[in-house]
């Protein structure tokens, strides 16, 4: 219907479903959805409801389809037709209720064949009696959001007034020129019905029952029963039922309104059974009587509540209804039903299972929801399954790899957690960055020689930094606390080899056991490893670990036997020990070069550098392409008060220049300045050159890769996605795990004690190493350690506030707080500890964790006494006259009573102890005494009294 006509009739464009509009416009639902998406409207499916403005846009998009049904609408007189004469008896018969239920009579059939115009006075009487609103006899098509066609007949459909044998309708039922037609009802809401108002295949239509024509769709005449003009059988109401569309505005009515005949398919007419309503099933007893304003008759069963304009429901308990048959199940419903039947049940829920070989790939830190999306399962069901397996987690909580493996094994899936390298590759592929393809595209003409990168590795205090100091002729050790390297240093030196000045890049790694990850990173970026072994100490644990890192990285090793100037030095012993690990010296017929050096005396330093250059030239192809965007790795990073984030990076390929936009781990930014290891400003850095970079948004972690991007927006997006992935992985790693067996005990005992820490340090590598070492501390199941925040730089006010909220301890590693921050921490009672050597921090935290543990007590036997006599006292109870057989008896000690080896009384206390007549603190072996055990009086001769005390057991 055009909007102009709607405006005339006072109607508004209502909501409608997409498939209903498509049917009205004569197009397919798919075309309608596609057109709406073209118009910029988001529509999920053809059953979605769209607002009135969107309805108008769709109608305007198909003007031809709208005009066609309007052209097919019947022409009707502009004014009501004169009322046709009717017999008074027939009019009374059409409205008078019947007391008893009876089949339709021939007179009723005859009355049905007469014109329906006389029904108008009856409706008028009903309106006056029930105070119904004018026009409530039928629904207004424009306002019914559930109507199939919104009052628009299909093109070519037969109009209601043109049906054969139908008399002219009354004035109340005649349509105005271009006026609306009643819309088709929505299927009923009776949940017990098998048909739900759907038409049966080959069934009879609503308006095609035998016995004569119905009243006009818009007529206000009485509702005929069984196709007759007689009253409805067994209707409990005292008045007539309203006309045919009255049920459309209320759910729960009897038969409800009928679809417009023009919207119904042509079917073979069959006679309707007697006693059945023309528009619905048999009316149930006790139906509410009278018309309700605005919505026809009240709902069945006497409940007068109406719905929001829904169509009429079916008959009572699904009988009859609108005469529609059972709807066939859709393919989707059948598939879901089949899956539910075939899916196994675990813990009361059905979850689709794999065949044991189904591989599911998940990212680090994935949640149950991510896993559920992969296998098309309900996350809540997986939470239930996990609970029955002894693990508790929420649907959005990040899980670790072990938990996923447990869940996957139970459900028949092989879960593969994507490695960080694959995860990084997938992330960069979303930005069209493929480094592997770039390397394959490079030819030999693009590659140029580059300096070797040498990593100095070895056990703690074997002289690695002293050796590097001798090479650089600078004092590096003086800057390290405790003589232990706690940073990764990168330096570049010049060496004359065969008359040519060659550059060598050195990386100094820590030797302390806490810095395993930093040593592994050093081995990963290196070309040659120098293994430093002290001639007096020999091979130590970190020596073997460094050797394993170098061998795993596949880099050649040069052994520097240091401290040969000390007494007791035995270089030959070192060679023999390293032979066991596969490092055979050249003089023994092997391939490993051994050089005896003294870093303190600067002995054989040149020989060591010469060995490095010979190894590089003989075993390695050291070339890189300098004519491209730089890529490399962050060696270390720190937060400088004046310069901000400062990262030491090693360029591996390409050339890094000032002004380039780079991404380093979760940090990004534009390079504002670069400095070499001497502090000299440089404008660009080629392959194998270490430089300090200023301008990053945050402090990258040691070992993070960096590369140059085209613009800052891309750099920021990559950094944010990396940060989100790292955060999920950290949450999964930090997740508290508690089994069902321990859950009840944990609830009974209270929360598990947790020591919260905030770690701040001067460089990121040291903070990371400290965190890893602290998380490895295991002092029992009763105490847990949690690092709630870590960062690089001075301790700030935000750190103190966070520690206040979470009752955390702040650990400062080579950093101090500002005076104002220290005052705030003192005022809030926040404990701050400061360390410059890493193992001191580890020892203190371990002792603190042990102090948080609940004390363990052990029973210590004190002595035994045998009862010789029993003295009864009304004031003190029974007193045991005893002789001490072993040990001693002490007042207030715990006691138990044994009779012939059987425990009689336990957890007693020695309340009184007398020696002769005097009170005694303790009585030793061989002496007699009187022992009072309080209210315990079950004592006999020859009973044994054992005394003991509970002493706190020291933590190991």
Swiss-Prot record:
Positions of GTP binding: 458-465, 508-512, 562-565
G4: annotated segments: 562-565
UniProt biased composition (Low complexity): 86-123, 141-156, 164-175, 212-235
Gene Ontology molecular function: GTP binding; GTPase activity; translation initiation factor activity
Bias-annotated ranges (Gly residues): 236-257, 276-324
GO cellular component: cytosol
Entry keywords, A to Z: Cytoplasm, GTP-binding, Initiation factor, Nucleotide-binding, Protein biosynthesis
UniProt-listed Pfam families: EF-G_D2 (PF22042), GTP_EFTU (PF00009), IF-2 (PF11987), IF2_N (PF04760)
Region (G3): 508-511
Localisation per UniProt entry: Cytoplasm
Role: One of the essential components for the initiation of protein synthesis. Protects formylmethionyl-tRNA from spontaneous hydrolysis and promotes its binding to the 30S ribosomal subunits. Also involved in the hydrolysis of GTP during the formation of the 70S ribosomal complex.
Family: Belongs to the TRAFAC class translation factor GTPase superfamily. Classic translation factor GTPase family. IF-2 subfamily.
Name of this chain's protein: Translation initiation factor IF-2
Organism whose genome encodes this protein: Renibacterium salmoninarum (strain ATCC 33209 / DSM 20767 / JCM 11484 / NBRC 15589 / NCIMB 2235)
């Amino acid at each position: 219907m055009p909007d102009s006509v709607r405006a005339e009739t006072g109607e508004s464009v209502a909501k409608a479903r997409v498939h209903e509009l498509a049917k009205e416009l004569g197009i397919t639902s798919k075309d309608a959805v596609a057109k709406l998406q073209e118009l910029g409207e988001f529509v999920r499916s053809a059953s979605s409801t769209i607002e009135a403005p969107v309805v108008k846009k769709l109608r305007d998009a198909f003007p031809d389809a709208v005009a066609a049904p309007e052209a097919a609408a019947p022409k009707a007189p502009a004014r009501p037709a004169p009322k046709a004469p009717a017999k008074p008896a027939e009019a009374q018969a059409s409205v008078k209720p019947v007391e008893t239920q009876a089949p339709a009579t021939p007179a009723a059939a005859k009355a049905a064949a007469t014109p329906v115009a006389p029904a108008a006075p009856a409706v008028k009487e009903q309106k006056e009696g029930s105070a119904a609103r004018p026009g409530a006899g039928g629904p207004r098509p424009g306002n019914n959001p559930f109507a199939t066609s919104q009052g628009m007949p299909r093109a070519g459909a037969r109009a209601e007034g043109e049906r054969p044998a139908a008399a002219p309708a009354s004035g109340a039922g005649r349509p105005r020129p271009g006026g609306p037609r009643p819309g088709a009802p929505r299927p009923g809401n009776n949940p017990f019905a098998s048909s739900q108002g759907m038409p049966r295949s080959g069934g009879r239509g609503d308006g095609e029952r035998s016995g004569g024509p119905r009243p006009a769709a818009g007529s206000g005449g009485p509702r005929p029963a069984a196709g007759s003009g007689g009253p409805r059988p067994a209707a409990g109401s005292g008045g007539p039922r309203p006309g045919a569309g009255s049920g459309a505005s209320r759910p729960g009515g009897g038969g409800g309104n009928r679809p417009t005949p023009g919207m119904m398919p042509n079917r073979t007419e069959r006679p309707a059974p007697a006693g059945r309503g023309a528009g619905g099933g048999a009316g149930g007893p006790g139906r509410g009587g009278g018309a309700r304003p605005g919505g026809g008759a009240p709902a069945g069963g006497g409940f007068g509540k109406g719905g929001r304009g829904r169509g009429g429901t079916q008959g009572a308990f699904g009988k009859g209804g609108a005469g529609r048959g059972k709807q066939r199940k859709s393919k989707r419903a059948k598939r879901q039903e089949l899956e539910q039947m075939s899916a196994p049940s675990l813990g009361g829920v059905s979850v689709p299972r794999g065949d044991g070989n189904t591989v599911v790939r998940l990212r680090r830190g994935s949640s149950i929801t991510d896993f559920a999306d992969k296998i098309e399962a309900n996350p809540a069901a997986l939470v239930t399954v996990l609970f029955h397996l002894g693990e508790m987690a929420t649907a959005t909580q990040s899980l670790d790899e072990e938990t996923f493996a447990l869940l996957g094994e139970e459900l028949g899936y092989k879960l593969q957690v994507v490695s960080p390298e694959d995860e990084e590759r997938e992330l960069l592929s979303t930005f069209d960055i493929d480094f592997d393809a770039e390397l394959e595209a490079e030819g030999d003409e693009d590659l140029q020689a580059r300096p070797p990168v040498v990593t100095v590795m070895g056990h703690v205090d074997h002289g690695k930094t002293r050796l590097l100091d001798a090479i650089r002729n600078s004092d590096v050790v003086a800057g390290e606390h405790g003589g232990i390297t706690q940073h990764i240093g990168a330096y570049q030196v010049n060496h004359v080899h065969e008359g040519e000045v060659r550059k060598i890049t050195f990386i100094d790694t820590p030797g302390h056991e806490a810095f395993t990850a930093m040593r592994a990173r050093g081995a990963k970026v290196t070309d040659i490893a120098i293994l430093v072994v002290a001639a007096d100490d020999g091979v130590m644990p970190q020596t073997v670990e460094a050797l394993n890192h170098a061998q795993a990285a596949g880099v050649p090793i040069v052994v520097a036997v240091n401290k040969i100037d000390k007494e007791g030095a035995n270089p030959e012993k070192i060679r023999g020990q390293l032979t066991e690990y596969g490092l055979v010296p050249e003089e023994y017929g092997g391939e490993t070069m051994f050089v005896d050096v003294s870093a303190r005396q600067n002995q054989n330093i040149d020989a060591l550098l010469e060995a490095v250059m010979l190894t590089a030239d003989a075993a390695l192809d050291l070339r890189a392409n300098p004519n491209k965007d730089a890529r490399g790795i962050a060696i270390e990073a720190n937060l400088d008060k004046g310069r901000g984030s400062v990262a030491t990076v090693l360029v591996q390929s390409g050339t890094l220049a000032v002004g380039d936009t780079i991404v380093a781990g979760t940090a990004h930014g534009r390079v504002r300045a670069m400095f070499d290891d001497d502090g000299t400003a440089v404008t660009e850095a080629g392959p194998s050159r270490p430089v300090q970079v200023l301008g990053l948004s945050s402090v990258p972690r040691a070992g993070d890769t960096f590369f140059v991007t085209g613009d800052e927006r891309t750099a920021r997006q990559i950094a944010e996605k990396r940060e989100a992935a790292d955060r999920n992985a950290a949450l999964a790693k930090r997740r508290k795990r508690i089994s069902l067996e321990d859950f009840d005990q944990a609830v009974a005992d209270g929360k598990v004690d947790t020591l919260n820490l905030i770690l701040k340090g001067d460089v990121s590598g040291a903070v990371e190493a400290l965190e890893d070492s602290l998380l490895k501390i295991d002092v029992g199941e009763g105490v847990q350690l949690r690092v709630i925040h870590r960062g690089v730089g001075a301790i700030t006010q935000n750190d103190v506030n966070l520690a206040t909220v979470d009752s955390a301890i702040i650990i400062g590693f080579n950093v101090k707080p500002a005076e104002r921050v220290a005052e705030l921490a003192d005022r809030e009672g926040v404990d701050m500890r400061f360390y410059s050597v890493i193992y001191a921090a580890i020892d203190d935290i371990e002792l603190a964790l042990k102090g948080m543990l609940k004390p363990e007590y052990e029973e210590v036997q004190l002595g035994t006494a045998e009862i010789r006599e029993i003295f009864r006292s009304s004031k003190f109870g029974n007193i045991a006259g005893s002789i001490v057989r072993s040990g001693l008896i002490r007042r207030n000690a715990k006691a138990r009573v044994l009779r012939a080896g059987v425990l009689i009384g336990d957890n007693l206390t020695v309340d009184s102890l007398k020696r002769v007549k005097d009170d005694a603190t303790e009585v030793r072996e061989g002496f007699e005494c009187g022992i009072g055990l309080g209210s315990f009086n079950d004592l006999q001769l020859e009973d044994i009294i054992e005394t003991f005390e509970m002493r706190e057991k020291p933590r190991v």
